[in-house]
Amino acid sequence: MVKSHIGSWILVLFVAMWSDVGLCKKRPKPGGGWNTGGSRYPGPGSPGGNRYPPQGGGGWGQPHGGGWGQPHGGGWGQPHGGGWGQPHGGGWGQPHGGGGWGQGGTHGQWNKPSKPKTNMKHVAGAAAAGAVVGGLGGYMLGSAMSRPLIHFGSDYEDRYYRENMHRYPNQVYYRPVDQYSNQNNFVHDCVNITVKEHTVTTTTKGENFTETDIKMMERVVEQMCITQYQRESQAYYQRGASVILFSSPPVILLISFLIFLIVG
């Protein structure tokens, strides 16, 4: 009987301590809230204050008070007070104030433009899909690949390919797979844009391609485009599965519960 009472008191004490810790976490810190000691616009009874606090009493019309229209008070329009538009106060737009917007004492804190936020979805998509190529209408450049070993049906063509394969592209241009209805359309578009871009770029450097080069280049690029399609399709379905997983109600409830435990 005594042991059960002791266990009950220990449980009550533990719950009380846990509640007190939770309240301490949620209790506002002194000096950091609105109209507290650390506020830029403190109230009449606040321990802290502006850089130029009122110097006198608190009656209206007194020479050193804090009422409206006093010469040395803290009311609106006073020459040495802390109200709005005062030359030495701490209100909005004052040249020597201590905490308002655009004041000299803030050192441009409120005037600095906010930094643009990076969209993490776009960053992740660009990293997974490849870099978007400017001037090619939304095409992306895939990662470098090893040129495949292809047999063209004759010893001459096989030897010619082995001797000239370094002149052919090892990267392909493509668009996201969700813009195509099937693999054939993706590969066809990928081959055309890659061969065209590589041919134009190489020709401007003073190197020309023969009909044999174009034939072999199309075969090589076709194999590379098929590989690129398989990679992109797999990555696309994996991203879709991840979105479905994290959008399911049980997962959302679990994540919300974990966040509640961490924050609370």
UniProtKB/Swiss-Prot annotation:
Disease entry from the Swiss-Prot or TrEMBL record: Found in high quantity in the brain of humans and animals infected with degenerative neurological diseases such as kuru, Creutzfeldt-Jakob disease (CJD), Gerstmann-Straussler syndrome (GSS), scrapie, bovine spongiform encephalopathy (BSE), transmissible mink encephalopathy (TME), etc.
Protein name (record): Major prion protein
Keywords assigned: Amyloid, Cell membrane, Copper, Disulfide bond, Glycoprotein, Golgi apparatus, GPI-anchor, Lipoprotein, Membrane, Metal-binding, Prion, Repeat, Signal, Zinc
Repeat keyword on record: yes
UniProt keyword annotation of Hydrolase present: no
GO cellular component, as recorded: Golgi apparatus; plasma membrane; side of membrane
Binding site for Cu(2+) 4: H96, G98
Superkingdom of origin: Eukaryota
Organism lineage string: Eukaryota, Metazoa, Chordata, Craniata, Vertebrata
Subunit details: Monomer and homodimer. Has a tendency to aggregate into amyloid fibrils containing a cross-beta spine, formed by a steric zipper of superposed beta-strands. Soluble oligomers may represent an intermediate stage on the path to fibril formation. Copper binding may promote oligomerization. Interacts with GRB2, APP, ERI3/PRNPIP and SYN1. Mislocalized cytosolically exposed PrP interacts with MGRN1; this interaction alters MGRN1 subcellular location and causes lysosomal enlargement. Interacts with KIAA1191.
Annotated source species: Ailuropoda melanoleuca (Giant panda)
Positions annotated as propeptide: 242-264
Gene: PRNP
Annotated segments matching region Disordered: 28-118
Broad class of where this protein is predominantly found: membrane
Family listed: Belongs to the prion family.
Residue stretches of each Sequence repeat: 54-62, 63-70, 71-78, 79-86, 87-94, 95-103
Residues holding Cu(2+) 1: H72, G73, G74
